[in-house]
Swiss-Prot record:
Keyword Metal-binding found: no
Superkingdom assignment: Viruses
Gene Ontology CC terms, in alphabetical order: host cell nucleus
Keywords: DNA replication, Host nucleus
Record's subcellular location: Host nucleus
Upper classification of the organism: Viruses, Duplodnaviria, Heunggongvirae, Peploviricota, Herviviricetes
Oligomeric and partner information: Associates with the primase and the helicase to form the helicase-primase complex. Interacts with the origin-binding protein. Interacts with the polymerase catalytic subunit.
Chief place where the protein resides: host cell
Biological role stated in the UniProt entry: Component of the helicase/primase complex. Unwinds the DNA at the replication forks and generates single-stranded DNA for both leading and lagging strand synthesis. The primase synthesizes short RNA primers on the lagging strand that the polymerase presumably elongates using dNTPs. The primase-associated factor has no known catalytic activity in the complex and may serve to facilitate the formation of the replisome by directly interacting with the origin-binding protein and the polymerase.
Protein name: DNA helicase/primase complex-associated protein
Region feature (Disordered): 43-63
Gene symbol of the encoding locus: UL8
Family statement drawn from the similarity comment of this UniProt entry: Belongs to the herpesviridae HEPA family.
InterPro entries cross-referenced by the UniProt entry: HSV_HEPA
Amino acid sequence: MRMRSLSAASSGYNGDPRGLGLERLKTVVRGKLRPSGSEIEWLWPSDQNNTASPAGAKTDQPTSAPRFFLTREATVFGPSWKPASRQIVASVLPVTGEMVMVSAERFSCMALFAVFLKLYRGFYMKPVAPCATHVRRPIMLAQFPVFDSRPSHGPQEQSGSHEPLARAAAQRRTKHNFLFMPGFPCLACVPISASAERHDRAMAACRAASLTEHLWPAYGIRALHMLNRTPAAASITRAVARRSRLLTADLTRSLETFPAGTITCAAGAPMIFSDCRLARLDFSAFYPCLYAAYVGKHRGLTKILHERLRRRAGSEDLKPALVTMFGGLRHVDANGYRFVVGASNIIAKAVEQTANRMGFGVAAYVKDGFWGAFDSSSKTTAEELRAECEKAANATLARLVVDKDGAGEPPVSLVLRLEGVYTDGLLINANKYWLFNSESGDSFICGVMGGHERSGLSRETTAAADDILKKIKASAKSIDDVEAIARSRIDAWIYAIFGHRGDVEFWAEQTPGDKDFLIPEEIRTTTVGKLEAADSCLGGELSYVFIPKNTQDTGAAKTKGGGARGWHSAPAAAFPCSLVEDVFCIKINYEAHLLPRLEGLLAWSRIYAWLQFRNQIPLADDEDESTTQAKETARIDYNYGDVSFLFA
């Protein structure tokens, strides 16, 4: 991982946290930093007289602090952006603590930074005694974005009729906050909601930090790999030889068909399922378990996987670490990544064959999970299906990794979970479907635009799509009924999100990486300079909101047609939220966020309506089915112009 200077010293940065964002922005503008390149940023501290000083300045050894100790001195050479020099460095570490618990309702990342700054000044900016032992003043280092200071609300604080969705979203928002700097205590800051989680949440965070040995998330994709203690040289040789044997010809061939994992969809999609037995199943920590089987003895990873698979209290905190490990596996262990994906393909084939023998047809298989329907004559229960498919998966994995002499048994067994049983469904493609249990009211929807994001807008949109499909199933008798249902629910969706105007957190989306970033003229100052060149550096990593490019004309212009597609907002650009929270106040281009989601809601409604009622509509002699479908479902529309004034 590369490191770049934030050039705070050269600009006279005096350690005031309120200027941190501006100094970072200046460095991005000058082209000295690319946040999307996984770089670590270095801040040169200043002395108490506001005069910037290099990292080579000497200070006294902090012997007066009983709760901290000074590490042994080390010699390093650097930095990389100027002529290298030899430097002696040391760090202060806490004696009794490694985590900080803070109030989720009142936590501020700037307050945490101020605490670290006070520690830093106390240890390293004291006057130098004439006979004191000197050490080099350490640099300050931070990786951005570091903080997620949004509160994690408990389930009882959520309102509305979609409590499971709201509760899941609230759980995803709970996150660790790290500010790690040489010379600072490297503390994990865990937000605790006193009203909802209390002691259990704190203990879960401590348990997760202990299992990862405080390496996550500070070391990102390499954190869990670092838990693997280096064996003796002879053991390394044997391990390399064993792993090379695991990349068999069959496994390699499977990568030619599915290089990123098995993704299949039933022929004939889109289609609907009515009054039948459906089941959705998913492997827990699937890819990390396969990697554990590949590497063999990896006690740190094995311990974490056992904790996660047993669903112990607080194990949810380990999921981001496991997901990140596999997300970057191709960059850390390319052969291990090839084995994991190839093994998952072979296991998927074995699982589907087992399911077919039990009278279960797979509608969609996506990497580590699948769903489908039982034959009407099948007597197999969903639990029996789960158990047999899990057994087949473990037997297949054992054949892939166990040697002829019986060595190499997987350290953890694969666990297949039954996520839900349903009676009705809509399949559009492998990544876009809806499942519903008419008896219990449970549902699951996948593929709604932004449905995987944490923002309030995405949660509201997912709930709206789910509601529309449920109401169509329950009461629609014709396409005209679908039109009325969609219009009514979209009205409710519009007015629900109306109350969140100006809330950057509610509207934030994940950065697409290839959007047109253009920061408006009103925040281009002589201090910051022109920002166009820096826009692309902010793509791909951060969350963003859309803003108008032309701030003089932010209204929408109506064109012929009048529907959702008949409105064109002023040109919009994505703007990184990290620059909004503490530095700028901007005007959000609401239409740029709303219109794609509105089209998505209409598309779900149109597809379901056509599949449900197409047998009632005769085809004209001069039309094919697609033409008739487009004509008949066009009436399911929504004129955004009628409500655009709400977001003007």
